From Swiss-Prot:
The gene is serS. This is Serine--tRNA ligase. Homodimer. The tRNA molecule binds across the dimer. It is found in: Cytoplasm. The lineage of its organism: Bacteria, Pseudomonadati, Spirochaetota, Spirochaetia, Spirochaetales. It comes from Treponema denticola (strain ATCC 35405 / DSM 14222 / CIP 103919 / JCM 8153 / KCTC 15104). HAMAP family: Ser_tRNA_synth_type1.
Length: 422
């Protein structure tokens, strides 16, 4: 959430940012409501002063008529205060709702665009494999090697669910331990997080827990949702808290299941493990001072690069365009791995990392005490270490062999206990 005063003083820039992001929000309405709230606050303060003056006057020596007049005035002031307080509460609610729809400001260097095709490639790492055979996609590999059962997943749970089987189970656990050990080396505190969060926490992070376009599974009548990422639970961990500055940055990593409705998702790249309703993910989350957030954002991206370089998976880094940014993100980097099973080979997103500045902290009321003793909103960042399903696609497709087997990346062999599948 943006600061109310910032919107008031920078309304044209805020409106342009909304336009660049292709989002629906009304900055002018927010300013109008802000002005209304300000006027009501002033009115309330004046009435409270009148009430105090009336109370002081009652302490003087008065005739019965004078006292009754002050009593009547006091009652009128009290009624007016109650009326203005009610109007102020409504204005506060309307202002909060209007501002909550306004996205974070985008980084000035973020490419302006509408969708992921407008993202800007900034680097490539690794060598795209050249096969002397027709490479299979992970769906066919999973079927041939008895690793993934989509048919049983659909029968038991519905479409976009699956069973991992046999060596694929060990492969997912190997990816998990590989990622955890890298994050531990970088000073991250590990968590296994709840799979359910309150709606107000999702709202604070920037997810829409309700509505037809919501990507979230809500638990009817509970006021809770299945989490789409550990960003939600790790971000809510310090809600309504004041954190000591000397303890910052706080670097957390959370392992969780992730549940996503994927409403409206379709197309060839939605097949198999790429876009499913449930998967496991290792997520990074950082709380820091505003001065640290840009550097820490680079650090998160470099950790993601380290993870995929260590796996020997070719990838590229893209600077996400304004239209492809989530509402909380100030800037976002995506890592896209090479996936040979896509039409003979294409890039597919495997991680992202976002600097959300103070957008989430304002919504969740997370602050730190600065050197001057003032409580200020801190910055939050998040980044995917490993989304296991997509990482598995990259491993299976890039490491497939001519005989139909899968070679295990060297970094994963100690965790798997085997070096080949098939």
């Amino acid at each position: 959430m943006l600061d109310y005063k910032f919107i008031k003083e920078n309304v044209e820039a805020v409106k342009q940012n909304i336009k660049n992001r292709h989002m629906n929000a009304d900055a002018d309405k927010a300013v109008e409501l802000y002005d209304k709230r300000t006027a009501l606050v002033t009115s309330l303060q004046n009435l409270q002063k009148d009430r105090n003056d009336n109370s002081q006057s009652m302490k003087q020596k008065l005739s019965p008529e004078e006292r009754q007049k002050l009593v009547d005035q006091g009652k009128a002031i009290k009624e007016k205060i109650a009326q203005v307080e009610a109007e102020l509460a409504e204005a506060e609610k309307a202002l909060h709702e209007a501002v909550s729809k306004i996205p974070n400001m985008a980084h000035p260097e973020a490419p302006v665009g509408k969708e992921d095709s407008d993202n800007l490639e900034v680097k490539r790492c690794g060598t795209v494999p050249k096969f002397d055979f027709e490479p299979k996609d992970h769906v066919q590999l999973g079927q041939d090697l008895d690793l993934i059962d989509f048919e049983a997943g659909t029968k038991v749970s519905g479409v976009k669910f699956y069973f991992l089987k046999n060596e694929a189970v060990f492969l997912e656990q190997a990816l998990t331990m590989y990622g955890l050990n890298i994050l531990r080396k970088h000073g991250f505190k590990p968590f296994i997080t709840p799979d359910i969060a309150k709606e107000e926490i999702l709202y604070g992070i920037g997810f829409n827990p309700r509505g037809e376009e919501s990507n979230v599974y809500s638990l009817e009548g509970e006021g809770t949702c299945l989490v789409a990422t550990a960003e939600i639970t790790l971000g809510g961990y310090h809600s309504d808290e004041i954190i000591k500055k000397e303890s910052l940055p706080l670097k957390y990593c959370g392992l969780s299941h992730c549940f996503r409705r994927e409403a409206g998702a379709a197309g060839q790249f939605s097949k198999g493990l790429y876009r499913v309703h449930q998967f496991s993910k290792l997520e990074m989350f950082v709380y820091c001072t505003p001065e640290e957030s840009d550097a820490l954002h680079e650090e998160l991206r470099l950790i993601e690069e380290e993870i995929f370089n260590g796996l020997g998976i070719p990838f590229r880094v893209v600077d996400t365009c304004t239209g492809d940014l989530g509402a909380p993100a100030y800037r976002k980097w995506d890592l896209e791995a090479w996936m040979p099973g896509r039409n003979g080979g294409e890039w597919g997103e495997v991680t992202s990392t976002s600097n959300c500045t103070d957008y989430q902290a304002r919504r969740l009321n997370i602050r730190y005490k600065d050197d001057d003793g003032k409580n200020k909103f801190l910055h939050t960042l998040n980044g995917t270490a490993l989304a296991m399903s997509r990482a598995m696609i990259a491993v299976l497709e890039n490491y497939q062999q001519a005989d139909g087997s899968i070679k295990i990346p060297e970094a994963l062999v100690p965790y798997c206990g085997f070096d080949r599948i098939g």
